[in-house]
Amino acid sequence: MSKSKTSITNADFVHLHNHSEYSAFDGLNKLSQFPKAAKEMGFKALALTDHGNIGGAIKFMQACRDKDNKDFDIKPIVGAEFYLSKDRNMRGQRKDGDKIVVKGQPDGRKGNRHLVLIAKNWKGWQNLCTLSQLSWTEGYYIDPRIDLSLLAQHSEGLICNSACLSSVVNANLLHGRFEEAKKAVGIFKDIFKEDFHLEVMYHGID
């Protein structure tokens, strides 16, 4: 009996973690080029998740829904990659190269971790805007930050992805802190329920 294989086409696959020129020091892609590139690769949708802000969201949505170019009709998915702190009001951090280190943290752990949030409906968009605003007005210190208490208050309508190697979950896994990684997953699942997902990212290693 031959084994059946699951085939994933480009039409089934959507990139949910992308940075544009609105990600300071971390984005080279121009928003105006996103729809064309997505269309050329056979995608029907694409997400924008810039670091610490949603400044490019409207421009991104307009580019994906260009009325003058039906060929580039890509479904825009809007989110952001937030900086997550244990306490958004905490100070006493310092720069160490490209890392942000918190006083008293063992083995020089970074104080701010990454977390991807994506709006799945209008309420999610409202909460995305609220979290972005509060990260700058209440949580800004080196980076615009949010914390778990804000997430718990403004989680409705949002999808949460664990993010990159700089996330709470993946950084703990990378350093062998498996119980801490499991604990973090449990916390996010408590907040987002079925809308929390572990992110899979291509890293070029077989």
Language model segments and positions:
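Phosphodiester-processing cores and adjacent nucleic acid-binding clamps
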Residues: 1-206
